[in-house]
């Protein structure tokens, strides 16, 4: 119905999934704020019609929404984390992505580090999980191990390849 909402979620064991929260938009909803973005919750689900399940019960484990939404930089960082998660998480590799995402959001909400540092670490680790490890100790062009390197948007270059690229 009009008061229902489809909720996107990352689960510990079943990957990214969607479920219907019935009557969530009504003022007396039993779910209400528990299913806002960036919440860590425990859910009970039943099989609904078709492929969507229905949320029947929810318990808040950690409320990250308020601290994240109250800080614009933290909010935009969380949005990039969510977008990266939705585009780069294969269903068969859920546990590492779940742990990485939960850790990033918890750190962001508790303001333990600057949001840009949290995002850089998250993206680096998410890229590695997706099979695109960041290489900083070898040249991306010739493969030479190089302690002295030149950084480009595509990776690290040794002095010889950097000189060739600029001439």
Q: Which ranges hold each PLM region?
A:
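Non-catalytic alpha-helical scaffolds and adjoining flexible linkers that form interface surfaces
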Residues: 1-6, 10-167
């Amino acid at each position: 119905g009009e008061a229902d909402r489809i909720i996107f979620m990352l689960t510990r064991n079943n990957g990214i999934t969607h479920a219907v929260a019935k009557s969530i938009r009504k003022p007396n909803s039993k779910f209400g704020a528990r299913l806002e973005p960036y919440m860590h919750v425990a859910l009970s689900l039943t099989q609904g019609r078709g492929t969507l399940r229905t949320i029947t019960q929810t318990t808040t484990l950690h409320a990250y929404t308020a601290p994240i939404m109250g800080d614009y930089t933290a909010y935009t960082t969380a949005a990039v984390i969510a977008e990266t998660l939705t585009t780069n998480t294969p269903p068969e590799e859920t546990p590492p992505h779940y742990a990485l995402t939960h850790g990033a959001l918890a750190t962001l909400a508790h303001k333990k580090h600057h949001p840009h540092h949290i995002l850089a670490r998250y993206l680096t680790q998410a890229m590695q999980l997706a099979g695109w490890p960041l290489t900083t100790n070898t040249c991306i062009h010739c493969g030479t191990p190089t302690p002295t390197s030149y950084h480009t948007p595509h990776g690290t270059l040794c002095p010889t390849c950097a000189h060739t690229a600029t001439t």
